[in-house]
Curated annotation (Swiss-Prot):
Belongs to the universal ribosomal protein uS7 family. This is Small ribosomal subunit protein uS7cz/uS7cy. Keywords: Chloroplast, Plastid, Ribonucleoprotein, Ribosomal protein, RNA-binding, rRNA-binding. One of the primary rRNA binding proteins, it binds directly to 16S rRNA where it nucleates assembly of the head domain of the 30S subunit. The gene is rps7-A.
Amino acid sequence: MSRRGTAEEKTAKSDPIYRNRLVNMLVNRILKHGKKSLAYQIIYRALKKIQQKTETNPLSVLRQAIRGVTPDIAVKARRVGGSTHQVPIEIGSTQGKALAIRWLLGASRKRPGRNMAFKLSSELVDAAKGSGDAIRKKEETHRMAEANRAFAHFR
């Protein structure tokens, strides 16, 4: 048995302008090469563009987009008797949000366009409306889990 204690779960800090944890999670995921100020600039520009496009609160659009992309269930590869099965597992809220943010950023990076702020704002607006690559990724994950439902007892 391990003598080591369990690690405390870290709570995400909130960003300086919007005082929102989701914005901070987004900033930390978009971060490259330690350039946090650039990451903040990209996120704030994207939120400003969302404000201009939708004429609503950009934070509510962000929340709606993340809620729409967050998966309830995912598949995990599990080796049983020499063969690998895709076993569906339920996902907690924190892990689901992290996956949603990763998918949103991945989809916005793949988009054609001028700059990252523009691409991210477009992807967030699309996800809030229920379309876009990130939503497609969620539906694909749910489809995979449904197809492999027979292996759920391998959990």
